[in-house]
Each structure stands twice: as C-alpha cells, then as structure tokens.
A protein has these predicted regions:
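A short hydrophobic beta-strand segment most commonly corresponding to one strand
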Residues: 88, 101-111
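A short, N-terminal "cap"/entry segment at the start of jelly-roll beta-barrel domains
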Residues: 1-39
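Localized chelating/binding microdomains
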Residues: 31-32, 64, 93
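Short acidic-glycine-tyrosine-enriched beta hairpin
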Residues: 75-92
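Conserved short histidine dyad/triad with adjacent acidic residue
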Residues: 35-56, 90-91
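Short hydrophobic/aromatic-rich beta-strand segments that constitute the beta-sheet cores
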Residues: 54, 71, 105-107
Length: 111
C-alpha cells in the first residue's frame, strides 16, 4: 500500500447550511479533498460560526487547523477546542457543536 497525500490547498466545494441547526443564522459547512481510504474516509471540513447537532454516527478523529469552538456531548460538559487541538469521537457520539470562529479541520471517519 502506498501513502495518500491530502493537500491542504485543495479546493473546497460550495458552502451549504447544516441540516440540524440550533441557532440562527444556520452555520455553513463545506468540504475539500474528500477521499475514501481503507478504514473509512478523510478530508478537510470547514464551518462558519453557529450551533448545530453532530450528525456523524461513525467514529471520527478531528485535528483542528484553524478556528475555535466547543462540542458538548449529550449529558456531558462542553469540550473547548482551538487550532492545534484534536478530538476523537467514539461511534454514536451525539451532542452539539458551537463554532465561535470559523473552523477548519482535517478528519478521518472510521467505517
């Protein structure tokens, strides 16, 4: 197997409103370099400020490149993050994102 390069300067698709917003205006998301890999999928994700429910049911690892915000798991305390931080979400983690400053992250979703 050979390495897969995922370029940071990949072109992003058009922004779309999140489907489960909990604030107005709805946050906008867009992705770049989405690729299938042997364990799932990977790419870049960007989101404007706002609150919304997490919609990914698979396990996910996220490394934040820029921005800041928090994630509050259902029944838990907020987890604040900023550029340079990383979060691992176990499968079926549910909760609410609160994006304070536009966030860009690299992610791996495990199937």
């Amino acid at each position: 197997m050979s390495p897969t390069l995922i370029r940071a300067d990949s072109a992003f698709g058009p922004p779309v409103a999140v489907s489960m917003p909990t604030s107005e205006p709805a946050a906008l998301v867009r992705t770049a370099a989405d690729q299938d890999i042997p364990v799932g999928s990977t790419g870049f994700w960007e989101c404007t400020p706002g609150r919304f429910r997490r919609q990914v049911h698979q396990a996910e690892y996220s490394c934040f490149i820029s921005g800041e915000g928090s994630f509050t798991p259902d029944g838990g305390e907020p987890i604040a993050f900023r550029a340079g931080d990383a979060i691992y979400f176990a499968a079926n983690t549910e909760g609410e994102w609160n994006i304070v400053e536009t966030v860009r992250k690299a992610y791996v979703i495990f199937e």
